[in-house]
Curated annotation (Swiss-Prot):
The keyword Nucleotidyltransferase belongs to this UniProt entry's keyword annotation: no
GO CC, any one term: cytoplasm
Group of enzyme by EC: hydrolase
UniProt name for this protein: Exodeoxyribonuclease 7 large subunit
Source species: Leptospira interrogans serogroup Icterohaemorrhagiae serovar Lai (strain 56601)
One example of a Gene Ontology biological process annotation: DNA catabolic process
């Protein structure tokens, strides 16, 4: 035997506890099994064991966790799955599963489907905060979409009437659980959105129920109806859970129908107080405006225009006459200047015509002179032109040869001649 110091029971237990608390595999785990040894203490804590064919584990479901449980009552023999963390009870030296959530078998798949739908709708922007409609401060007409026979509608009407007796209430009855519930809820919301009813705010929901009872408010059609509503919607489903999709799509959600009515409907005394304050502000604003306008009128009445209006009018009239005379003179000067310019243009035109006439006469004279000196005119006076066979003009006898044939150009035509002699 080794000479080591023996451990106390407490020390061993503490070591085991540290090992358990330090293990990630024993934290936030799901465990499934059959309930046995079920009991509920006066403190509200629930104790039971989960067992299968080979083992058993003690479980504690404390009251601060089990008060949110809305499923079917727990009892021995029921198959469930629980979520929690393994802890060690030092005094007894036994380990225990500290339960924070309980689901009936099969609920896990449903929750997974709800989570997938939640993610899909979130991507579409169905839950975006900026799309939320503002709940009116002073609604005239309240619309209610819920079961006509449940406690929820009684609570909503009772609270609404007690807070503001004059509120108009319009009820669109619908089925709130079961296979037909989603279509019924959607129809009720669409009816309350009809413009004829002039509904200012809608409370839609029901009292508490089990996980299965509340499934209609996780239906995609219902969630979209909430999001597409023209009228602001307050979701009011009792025993709120963290997977109720209609709560996320609503413009506001409350944990109970009673809380929804209290949120939607103001107290009559608060409305009267608001109106009184508003009246006071309006009166104060009017008094300030009247006083300001009175001072302005007093200031304006001391000005010259109000003291001697006719004198000012005469001055303005005289000024208009002066401007008219100046305009008349300016127009007359413009016309005279234009007239002088026109006369200048007319004289210039006459001078240009005379110059053109003289230029034409000179051109005709010189044209006549040029024509008189042309070969044709000279030949008309009895002269002729002599050319050799190459067309060269003969100017002297030396340029020809005896017996050479020549061409004579006369005024009336041409003829051929032959040179004779030397």
């Amino acid at each position: 035997m080794e000479d080591s110091k023996p451990l106390s029971v407490s020390e061993v237990t503490r070591i085991i506890k540290n090992l358990i608390s330090g293990s990630k595999d024993l934290k936030n785990i799901w465990v499934r099994g059959e309930i046995s040894n079920y009991s509920k203490a006066s403190s509200g804590h629930i104790y039971f064991s989960l067992k299968d064919a080979g083992s058993l584990i003690r479980c504690t479901f404390f009251n601060y966790s089990n008060k949110n449980y809305s499923g079917k009552p727990l009892s021995d023999g029921k198959e469930i799955q629980v979520y929690g963390t393994i802890t060690l009870y030092e005094a007894g030296g036994s380990y225990n599963l500290n339960v924070t959530r309980v689901e009936e078998l099969g609920q896990g798949d449903i929750l997974l489907q709800i989570e997938k739908l939640k993610q899909k709708l979130a991507v579409e922007g169905i839950f975006d905060p900026e799309k939320k409609r503002r709940i009116p401060s002073f609604p005239k007409t309240l619309g209610i979409a819920t079961s006509p026979t449940g406690a929820a509608i009684e609570d909503i009407i009772k609270i609404s009437r007690s807070r503001f007796p004059g509120i108009n209430i319009l009820i669109a009855p619908c089925i709130v659980q079961g296979e037909d519930a989603p279509d019924s809820i959607v129809a009720a919301i669409e009816e309350l959105n009809h413009p004829n009813w002039k509904v200012d705010v809608i409370i839609a929901g029901r009292g508490g129920g089990s996980f299965e009872d509340l499934m209609a408010f996780n239906d995609e059609k219902v969630v979209r109806a909430y999001a597409n509503s023209r009228v602001p919607i307050i979701s009011a489903v009792g025993h709120q859970t963290d997977v109720l999709l209609s709560d996320f799509a609503a413009d506001h959600f409350t944990p109970t129908p009673t809380a929804a009515a209290e949120y939607a409907i103001p107290k009559e005394e608060d409305v009267l107080q608001f109106l009184s304050q508003l009246e006071g502000r309006i009166k104060s604003s009017l008094v300030t405006k009247i006083s300001s306008n009175r001072d302005r009128l007093r200031l304006l009445s001391g000005k010259f225009i109000f003291k001697e209006p006719m004198q000012l009018l005469n001055q303005r009239s005289q000024r208009v006459d002066e401007i008219g005379i100046r305009l008349q003179k300016a127009l007359s000067n413009k016309l005279n200047l234009a007239r002088v310019r026109l006369e200048r243009y007319q004289n210039l035109t006459s001078r240009i015509q005379n110059i053109l006439f003289h230029k034409k006469q000179k051109a005709e004279f010189w044209t006549s002179k040029v024509e008189d000196l042309s070969p044709a005119a000279t030949m008309k006076r009895g002269y002729s032109i002599l050319r050799n066979e190459n067309g060269k003009i003969i100017r002297s006898p030396e340029e020809t040869k005896p017996e050479e044939e020549l061409q004579v150009l006369l005024s009336g035509g041409t003829m051929q001649v032959i040179r004779k002699g030397k």
